[in-house]
Curated annotation (Swiss-Prot):
NCBIfam families, alphabetized: pyrH_bact
GO cellular component: cytoplasm
Subcellular location, principal: cytoplasm
Region span, Involved in allosteric activation by GTP: 20-25
Stated name of the protein: Uridylate kinase
GO biological processes: 'de novo' CTP biosynthetic process; UDP biosynthetic process
EC number: 2.7.4.22
Function in brief: Catalyzes the reversible phosphorylation of UMP to UDP.
This protein's pathway: Pyrimidine metabolism; CTP biosynthesis via de novo pathway; UDP from UMP (UMPK route): step 1/1
Record text on activity regulation: Allosterically activated by GTP. Inhibited by UTP.
Family: Belongs to the UMP kinase family.
HAMAP family reported for this sequence: PyrH_B
Length: 237
């Protein structure tokens, strides 16, 4: 087996990834497949921090667009990420991966509070850490939470697993002539307004020189390929 090129990564999963083809909620077969893929990377010797979105259950941005108070909507979205975190913890432990959930909003009965040094200690002890509740603040996306946590745990890379096989110059679902980038700079992503992550998350990565690899989660084995340094998806650097 190839040696991983990264010792510690931050894996960002969208909430929608857990929903499978049904589009909402949590699909058992889908979450099992994701857990198997994450477990393969873990068993290759990579320390993994994981940030999960909540869009399969609740989208704060969408609710605020319909007139709901944005802060309230965002807090509801944060709680949705915690539901996903617990589901993912269960799925990962079934694959033999020791997992801890830390949340940015305290909920002591179901998860640890987020404490940076404790998170790093878990990683050093080869436990996978799932970070729930985003940053704990409204108006910040889970992409921004991923950038923040990646820097806090000293991850070498953010791996953003999506439903698309990389970054294109326009939406490949709508444009047959869309061109895929193998590599692209942070500033190009911002200038072109490409929907990789929100601009806050990209700017944080740019300021701290943290590379982002975005790739297709729906292809089994892609997470392992990414940590082994195979060229998949798009590198933002």
């Amino acid at each position: 087996m190839k040696e991983p090129v990264y010792k510690r990564i931050l894996l960002k999963l969208s909430g929608e990834a857990l929903a499978g083809k049904q589009g909402t909620g949590i699909n058992t077969a889908t979450i099992t497949q994701i857990a198997q893929d994450v477990a393969a990377a873990y068993k290759a010797g990579v320390q993994i921090g994981l940030v999960i979105g909540g869009g399969n259950i609740y989208r704060g941005v969408a609710a605020s667009a319909e007139g709901m108070d944005r802060a309230s909507a965002d807090y509801m979205g944060m709680l949705a990420t915690c539901i996903n975190a617990l589901a993912l913890q269960d799925a990962l432990e079934k694959q033999g991966v020791p997992t801890r959930v830390q949340t940015a909003i305290e909920m002591a009965e179901i998860a640890e509070p987020y404490i940076r040094r404790r998170a790093i200690r878990h990683l050093e002890k080869n436990r996978l850490v799932i970070f729930g509740a985003g940053t704990g603040n409204p108006f910040f996306t889970t992409d921004t939470a991923a950038s923040l946590r990646a820097m806090e745990i000293n991850a070498q890379v953010i791996m953003k697993a999506t439903k698309v096989d990389g970054i294109y110059d326009k939406d490949p679902a709508k444009h047959a002539d869309a061109k895929k980038f193998d590599k692209i700079s942070y500033i190009d992503v911002l200038n072109r307004g490409l929907q990789v992550m929100d601009s806050t998350a990209i700017s944080m990565c740019m300021d701290n020189k943290l590379p982002i690899i975005t790739f297709d989660l729906t292809v089994p084995g892609n997470i392992l390929k990414a940590v082994q340094g195979e060229t998949i998806g798009t590198l933002v650097h």
